Each structure stands twice: as structure tokens, then as C-alpha cells.
UniProtKB/Swiss-Prot annotation:
Described function: NDH-1 shuttles electrons from NADH, via FMN and iron-sulfur (Fe-S) centers, to quinones in the respiratory chain. The immediate electron acceptor for the enzyme in this species is believed to be ubiquinone. Couples the redox reaction to proton translocation (for every two electrons transferred, four hydrogen ions are translocated across the cytoplasmic membrane), and thus conserves the redox energy in a proton gradient.
Cell inner membrane keyword on record: yes
This protein's name: NADH-quinone oxidoreductase subunit C/D
Top-level EC class: translocase
Family label: In the N-terminal section; belongs to the complex I 30 kDa subunit family. In the C-terminal section; belongs to the complex I 49 kDa subunit family.
Region NADH dehydrogenase I subunit D, annotated ranges: 208-593
Membrane topology: Peripheral membrane protein
High-level lineage: Bacteria, Pseudomonadati, Pseudomonadota, Gammaproteobacteria, Chromatiales
PROSITE patterns: COMPLEX1_49K
NCBIfam families registered for this protein in UniProt: NuoC_fam, NuoD, PRK06075.1, PRK11742.1
Native species: Nitrosococcus oceani (strain ATCC 19707 / BCRC 17464 / JCM 30415 / NCIMB 11848 / C-107)
Entry EC no(s): 7.1.1.-
Compartments where located: Cell inner membrane
Region (NADH dehydrogenase I subunit C): 1-184
Quaternary structure annotation from Swiss-Prot or TrEMBL: NDH-1 is composed of 13 different subunits. Subunits NuoB, CD, E, F, and G constitute the peripheral sector of the complex.
The gene coding this protein: nuoC
Length: 593
């Protein structure tokens, strides 16, 4: 670990700023630039320009923006702080990512009326398919020319669009729910799969295709997740993933919680990631609030995040081996995970969902003896991982089941929005901790494991090597833990510093208001992404200058990853699909939110 604090990696030098390129190509009069707290270049464009500009940025610009990182919307109708922004009832937000430039680009489209619409961009990015369906589902924005614009997170029979500001947010605001036998029959019928709705044929020549429901209750789909398979014998002709069974309205909840009380909800997104879920959220809030946390806070956060990375990867490793027929590894690895949880419990007081990060710091300082627990674990795990290499990764049956199965290229990964280990498994060395260091990661020495084939085996191998690199990072945290406070000295740090409560009446009132109502975060927008356990996880937060977020957008890695299933399963056998699903490493809470 280097002792000197370095600045995060800036966008690659030598490239013309994107604003100049866009102004030269399309005319400056066609853009309105918006300043944001996160520094991401943000431009407003008209819906008539969307396809032309996005196609240029992806296919004609050199170097391009090859990935549609996110696509979401904002209901602007009750927002008060919008300085310099065009009039808009709803705003569509396109978030693009360029790996060569190491730069993001945000394009916004103002939309008017109760039933706005604009052209689909699925011919440009196939990954837009699910994102546009989600926007239609939750906001009611129509996408002209979309191949199958329908509900994706909510039941087909749902009335309304929940992320509109006029949609009820609490059960007490709607009539009591009842499920009569007639209604139950209608709900079940609405879920009936009809191949024609998806452009599928029931037969080809003399062959009748079989349609198989895999899930939503099946151990190999890792949660309440349904895939409808079109089969010719045991060969997969096509597949239709069906998500939403685990949808809990996490983004809607953010609009009725204070900035502080929303932290426990973030723990439940990737429920195997623990406090790593808190990190992008609190970093984004701190960016909005202008909070600089102490060095000790940064290192504590990194150490806890890497412990949860190991815990999550151990679950992945064991269940992946189980999916392809090895039963022993999962028992060994869950035992190791309990060792990790013992450390986390000693530090945080909780195991899977400690909700321990805070705006401006962490909940408590490290307890006495934390270093001995870490030191023991650093001695314990490496020989265990070496043993697992022998019994699992070197097993010829596991290799036969996973090598060359479920593979994709770097170009396909970018096309579909793949990030994290899934992207590095096909040869691209891209990790937010290196390319865009946050929370002091620039001070740590570690390598980025990269494979070449993009198959099931390589996706597993990358995660195993990541555990070894996480151990390196944790050891540096142990050896170089800075002294100092576990909480920033800032008025918006939440909860505020207790020792100041009784200083005078003003600090007492400030403490009371901050704890009871929550901090008032300045108006603005910020998006922070991190290298989470399953890929890149981002929180895009909008404050309207109140104690609650105006908009909470959660970009999870698992959502686009599952959208790739039809691409990588066509032509394979059903057992190969089971291996592929296990290698993606997803949990449905991360997909459905």
C-alpha cells in the first residue's frame, strides 16, 4: 500500500473533449449542457435526435462509447430545483460508457404529456430491450418500434406505473388486497406463455418444438426466476427469461425514506454483498453533500468491502461446482464463509446485512482485537483455496462441463452491458478499482485477473483469483490502517458527532433534526459506480434539496447479465444452460430490486 494519496484516474488524455465533438458534428445549438456533482458530461437533446446521436457515438466516433451502461427515467413534474434545464414532464436518461476514453456520457431527453413516446434504440443496442421495458413498466413511457414492449418487473395485470410521482407508495394509500379464486385464475392465465407473443414457432417442418418452464421454483435458477426454453429434443432453440418475481420497489422506497434511513434497503439489493451495497450509495450522497471522509474511514470501508467480496465469491464457487455435479465444495466453502461472517460480526455487529456504512463514515470504530481476527483469516484461507483448485478447478469432469460452454466475446459483452468478472473473463482488463479508484483504492497494490475465452470456466477462474487479490488488499489494510476518526467532521455527517450534541442549544437542535428528520442534502445529481461482487453497481441520486431523495436509480450488474441468456444458450443443451446460469453469478434481488 502506498502512503501518498493519489487522485483518481482522469479520462484518458489525448482525446478531444466530447462536448467539442458533439458540437462540431451536430451543432452546438442542438445541445443544452447541464452541470452535475459527479462531473459526468451531461447534455439535453431532443427525441428526434436520439437515434442519430447514439448511433454516431457507438459506431462512428473513434474511440466510441460501445456500452449502454444504463437507461432510466425521471418524473420531473413536482421537482423544484432544475436550474438551466429544459421544461420536461418526464426525462429519459441514457448513460453511455467508453472504455478506451475511460469516460461516461449522459444524454437526457425531455418528454411532455401523460403518455410520452420516442423511438426505441434496440437496433443500436440490444441491451436497451430490457431497460426500455423497465421504463415503460415503471414510468409509462412508450418506445416506438420496440420488439416486445411489455411489463418486465410487475405482473401483466398491474394498473399504473409505480415510479410516477402520483402513484401510491404505501399500502395504506390503496384498497386492501384480496385474492378471490376468480382473480387468482386471471393472474395465472396472464402468466401463460404463448410462443407467438415472442415471435417463436411451435413447429418447424416435421418437428414439433417443446416448451419447458425452468423455474420460477428450481434450484438451478438461483432464485425466483423463470426461463421458458424452446427445445428441439434437448437442444435449446431459444429462451425467454422472465424476471420480476422478487421485485420489491427498492427505487420507489428511496423516495419515502430519509437519506440516512435508506441505507438498510441498499443491503438487500445484492444480498450476498453486504456493506458493499452501501458503498456506492453513501459515496453518491457524500458527493452531493460535499463530504470528504477521513483516511481511516476509506481504509475501513475497503477492508469490509473486500471481506464481503470473498464471502460472495465463496458462495458462487461452491454453488457453481454443485451446479455441475460436485457436492463437496459447497460445504467446505460455506464453512469458510462463516469464518468471514465471524469477522464481520465482530466488527459490525451483524453478519449478512450489517448496514454499517454511514453518510460521512462508518457506524463505529474498529473494536479491540479486530487485527488478530484478520491476521488469522489471512493465514487460514490461502491453503484452502489451493485445496479447492485441486478438487474443483483441476477436476476433469468440471473442465469438460464448463470449458467452451456459455462463451461470448468482448464485443458481445460490451453490446449487452456485461461488467465485472464477466467482462474480464473474455479478455478486457477493466476494473473500477483501478480505472476509477474510489475510497482510496489507488493506494493499494493488487492485480486484475483476466482470462481469454469468456466461458463458464474462465468466469469462475477470474472470481477465484479475485479472492486472492482481495486477501492482498485486506493484508494492506491490516498493516497500514490509518489513525484518526471513523466519522467526518461535517454538518451533514449522519448521525452527527455525538460529542457535540450538548455543546450549546444550536448543536442540540441540529443533532435532533438530523437524527429525527434526516439531513437536508443540497439539490443536485450524482452517480457513483463501484466494482461490486457481480460487476459494476451504481447509484444515480437526485436531490431536490429535501430530507429525502427525489430519485434513486440503482444500476445493478445482474440485470443486463441475465438479458444475455438467449444469446449464449442457443444451440446448447439443457445441462449446459445450468452451468451457464451458475457461472453468471447473480441473485434475483440484484436483478429485480
Amino acid at each position: 500500500m502506498r502512503s501518498s494519496l493519489q487522485q483518481p484516474t482522469p479520462p484518458m488524455a489525448g482525446f478531444t473533449p466530447i462536448a467539442e465533438i458533439l458540437y462540431h458534428q451536430f451543432g452546438e445549438a442542438n445541445f443544452i449542457r447541464q452541470e452535475t456533482h459527479d462531473g459526468v458530461p451531461t447534455f439535453w437533446i431532443t427525441k428526434a435526435q436520439v437515434s442519430k446521436i447514439l448511433r454516431y457515438l457507438k459506431a462512428e466516433l473513434a474511440p466510441p462509447y460501445p456500452m449502454l451502461y444504463d437507461l432510466t427515467a425521471i418524473d420531473e413534474r413536482v421537482r423544484t430545483h432544475r436550474p438551466g434545464q429544459p421544461a420536461s414532464d418526464f426525462t429519459l436518461v441514457y448513460h453511455l460508457l467508453s472504455f478506451i476514453r475511460n469516460e461516461d456520457l449522459r444524454l437526457k431527453v425531455p418528454l411532455q404529456g401523460e403518455s410520452p413516446s420516442l423511438p426505441t434504440i434496440t437496433p443500436i443496442w440490444p441491451a436497451a430491450n430490457w431497460y426500455e421495458r423497465e421504463v415503460w413498466d415503471l414510468f409509462g413511457i412508450n418506445f416506438e418500434g420496440h420488439p416486445h414492449l411489455s411489463r418486465i418487473l410487475l405482473p401483466p395485470t398491474w394498473q399504473g406505473h409505480p415510479l410516477r410521482k402520483d402513484h401510491p407508495a404505501r399500502a395504506t394509500e390503496v384498497d386492501p388486497f384480496t385474492l378471490s379464486e376468480e382473480k387468482q385464475a386471471r393472474e395465472q392465465e396472464a402468466l401463460r406463455f404463448r410462443p407467438e407473443d415472442w415471435g417463436m414457432r411451435r413447429a418447424s417442418g416435421s418437428t414439433d418444438f417443446m416448451f419447458l418452464n425452468l423455474g420460477p421454483n428450481h434450484p438451478s435458477v438461483h432464485g425466483v426466476f423463470r426461463i421458458v426454453l424452446q427445445l428441439d429434443g434437448e437442444e435449446i432453440v431459444d429462451a425467454v427469461p422472465d424476471i420480476g418475481y422478487h421485485h420489491r420497489g427498492a427505487e420507489k422506497m428511496g423516495e419515502r425514506q430519509s437519506w440516512h434511513t435508506y441505507i438498510p434497503y441498499t443491503d438487500r439489493i445484492d444480498y450476498l454483498g453486504g456493506v458493499m451495497n452501501n458503498l456506492p450509495y453513501v459515496l453518491a450522497v457524500e458527493q452531493l453533500a460535499g463530504i470528504q471522509v477521513p483516511e481511516r474511514v476509506k481504509v475501513i470501508r475497503v477492508m469490509l468491502a473486500e471481506l464481503f467480496r470473498i464471502a460472495s465469491h465463496l458462495v458462487f464457487y461452491g454453488t457453481f461446482a454443485q451446479d455441475v455435479g460436485q457436492l463437496s465444495p459447497v460445504f467446505y466453502m460455506f464453512t469458510d464463509r462463516e469464518r468471514v461472517f465471524d469477522i464481520i460480526e465482530a466488527i459490525c455487529g451483524g453478519r449478512m446485512h450489517p448496514e454499517w456504512f454511514r453518510i460521512g463514515g462508518v457506524a463505529q470504530d474498529l473494536p479491540r482485537g479486530w487485527d488478530d481476527l484478520i491476521r488469522d483469516f489471512l493465514r487460514y484461507l490461502p491453503p484452502r483455496l489451493a485445496k479447492y483448485d485441486k478438487i474443483a478447478m483441476n477436476n476433469r469432469i468440471l473442465k469438460k462441463r464448463t470449458q467452451g460452454v456459455g462463451s461470448y466475446t468482448i464485443a458481445e459483452a460490451m453490446e449487452w452491458g456485461v461488467t465485472g468478472p464477466g467482462l474480464r473473463a473474455c479478455g478486457l482488463e477493466w476494473d473500477f478499482r483501478k480505472q476509477r479508484p474510489y475510497s482510496g483504492y489507488e493506494q493499494f497494490q493488487f492485480d486484475i485477473p483476466v482470462a481469454q475465452h469468456g466461458d463458464c470456466y474462465d468466469r469462475c477462474w477470474v472470481r477465484i483469483e479475485e479472492m486472492r487479490q482481495s486477501l492482498r488488499i485486506i493484508e494492506q489494510c491490516l498493516n497500514h490502517m490509518p489513525a484518526g476518526s471513523y466519522k467526518a467532521d461535517h454538518p451533514l455527517t449522519t448521525p452527527p458527532r455525538k460529542e457535540r450534541t450538548m455543546h450549546d442549544i444550536e448543536t442540540l437542535i441540529s443533532h435532533f433534526l438530523s437524527v429525527s428528520w434526516g439531513p437536508v442534502i443540497p439539490a443536485g445529481e450524482a452517480c457513483v459506480g463501484i466494482e461490486a461482487t457481480k460487476g459494476n453497481n451504481s447509484y444515480y441520486l437526485i436531490s431536490d434539496g429535501h430530507t429525502q431523495p427525489y430519485r434513486v436509480r440503482i444500476r445493478t450488474p445482474s440485470f443486463p447479465h441475465l438479458q444475455m441468456i438467449p444469446l449464449i444458450s442457443r444451440g446448447s443443451m439443457v445441462p449446459d444452460l445450468i452451468a451457464t446460469l451458475g457461472s453468471i453469478d447473480f441473485v434475483m434481488a440484484d436483478v429485480d430490486r
